[in-house]
Amino acid sequence: MQHTTIIQLSNVSISQSSGVVISNLSLSVQKGEFVYLLGKTGSGKSSVMKCIYAEVPMQSGSGTVAGYDLHALKRKDIPFLRRKLGIVFQDFQLLGDRSIFENLRFVMKATGWNDENEIKKTIAGVLEKVGLIGKGNKMPHEISGGEQQRVTIARALINQPEIILADEPTGNLDPDTSAEIMKLFQDISKNGTAVLFATHDMLLYNKFPARTLKCENGVVVEV
């Protein structure tokens, strides 16, 4: 089987206001691969994610994400890179005054979708993928935390991304719900979307083993 590299970082250093967070980071992720980014809170996992979606610049090294050269990336092109990425955070960031359907529609309109029939069809499709058929008319406060996280995953899948970046997506969920969400991410990767999954949850990691990068003492190593 031919492998397609979807994320490639070489000798990258990442700085935040506090100074250098990660040094000499080299990693590659293939199309459809599931990879853990494991590390304690504050170890630099989020900085790696932010570098990949071009929120934090590289201080040195080179990087290519979904065909975009991070070093040469112009500000005006960042939204085009991000359309190839789906980003899922620990906090759900749903609009509390809008239904699940309207939350997803809002994102679609913001990223250039105009055909209302296509919008409805696509939303129905992603809600089915994440196991939320029939929940489109519900308000966020009417569904559980696990279901809210499924909505954020549906939101991340809207534009058929090549990569999902999941930053502590199970941090606010109980163990059983976390396991369900993890199975969903694994299904997403099996369908051809790369998943980089940042977590400090060793229980989850031990239950669902996969290729692992560890963030510790300012470096990222494969374990």
For each feature predicted by the language model, list its residue ranges.
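ABC ATPase NBD coupling module
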Residues: 70-86, 188-190
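Conserved signature/switch motifs of ABC ATPase nucleotide-binding domains
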Residues: 138-141, 159, 191
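Conserved ABC transporter NBD signature motif
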Residues: 61-69
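Catalytic Walker B motif of ABC-type/P-loop ATPase nucleotide-binding domains
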Residues: 164-167
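Short coil-to-helix segment of the ABC ATPase nucleotide-binding domain corresponding to the Q-loop/switch region
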Residues: 98-106
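Conserved ABC ATPase signature
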Residues: 139-143, 147-149
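Helix-to-loop junction immediately C-terminal to a conserved catalytic motif
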Residues: 53
